Design a protein with these regions (language model features):
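Glycine-aromatic micro-motifs
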Residues: 1-168
């Protein structure tokens, strides 16, 4: 099932046609820190290779991914992670902020635990969905992608999540 949102926020199409990055570059200004497509692909490949086995691959949502996942997934489950907690700890000049007035966004910070929703990716197109997710979450490189244990009602699953990059 592919999730869409009725909200005027981010859509699959905006990510697929790279419109989100263009809008972000406009908003970010001349010294834009928006990642290039090549940087995003290299980042994803560093963690998950193009030929990775994604037959049982999950993504953990703790914020906007819960209500607007926009990824093709076959199953969802309530999940908990340990070692990270949800916190408004990243500043942004795009989306919820501007260059003149940065806004805070949720991230996962070290310590504690967090409850959210795990989405099982459709294995038929998992790598393409991960690339779409990288465009969404890694556009400013403010997050670090991590493979974590997701504790669900159907067992512990390996899953991807994005945690606060302490260097940003």
């Amino acid at each position: 099932m592919t999730s869409t949102s009725d909200s005027p926020g981010m859509t699959r199409e905006m990510l697929q046609n790279w419109r989100v990055a263009a809008l972000a570059r406009e908003r970010d200004g001349a010294d834009s820190s928006i990642a290039t497509e090549e940087q995003l692909l290299a980042s994803r490949r560093q963690l998950i290779a193009d030929d990775a086995d994604c037959s049982d691959f999950w993504v953990f949502g703790y914020g906007s991914l819960i209500y607007n996942p926009i990824i093709d997934h076959t199953h969802r489950a309530i999940a908990s992670i340990y070692g990270y907690h949800r916190r408004f700890c990243l500043w942004t000049k795009i989306g919820r902020g501007s260059p003149e007035c940065p806004g805070l966004v949720l991230s996962l910070d070290r310590g504690g635990s967090c409850r959210g929703v795990a989405f099982q990716l459709n294995p038929q197109n998992a790598i393409a969905e991960l690339d779409l997710l990288w465009r969404r979450e890694m556009m400013t490189l403010a997050y670090q992608p991590r493979l974590l244990s997701l504790h669900t009602e159907i067992g512990v699953k390996l899953g991807l999540d994005f945690v606060a990059n302490p260097n940003r």
